[in-house]
Amino acid sequence: LAGSSAASDVYKRQFLGSLIVLAFQPFNYWLVTFLIPGLLYQLIKTEGIKNTFFISYFFGFGLWAFGIFWIENSITVYGGASPILGSFLTLLLAAFLSLFQAISFTAFKLVSSQRKTHEIFLLFPAAWVLSEWLREFLFTGFPWLYIGYTAVDNSLLQGYIPIPVSYTHLTLPTILLV
């Protein structure tokens, strides 16, 4: 990320991460789900470990900053905090949650460096599931923005897939389709 375009690169990664929010309710542009992970893969496939960490971190920051905007409202309206404090706390949470994407995709990069192409296409979805699993079970228990949720309300799968198993039964197949 060095050079004069470093700030521009950061914004591009954040923008890409924020676009995936469009796949969720209330927007429900679920086809975005098939485009954005593929673009993230294209961004990190030729990068080194350090750049992969930063690319996936800023991607995650865009995802979380736009995906959990409602928390700021909860903090200010129901918690009585100032809007500045509510915004700061929400961005702080987004910064923390972004670490899960960064760790998972950096692990993907470490594992995939000596793999064949068909193995990489299985490892990338596994890294996405790992980021959701780490967030859910090991650290925060924050069940928000599972990519598998985008498949629940689309016309193809509506009513067929239970929500409680979203990340295992929806996230992996969704990312595999990319």
Model regions: which residues?
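Positively charged, low-complexity/disordered segments
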Residues: 1-7, 171-174, 178
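Membrane-embedded alpha-helical bundles of multi-pass enzymes
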Residues: 8-172
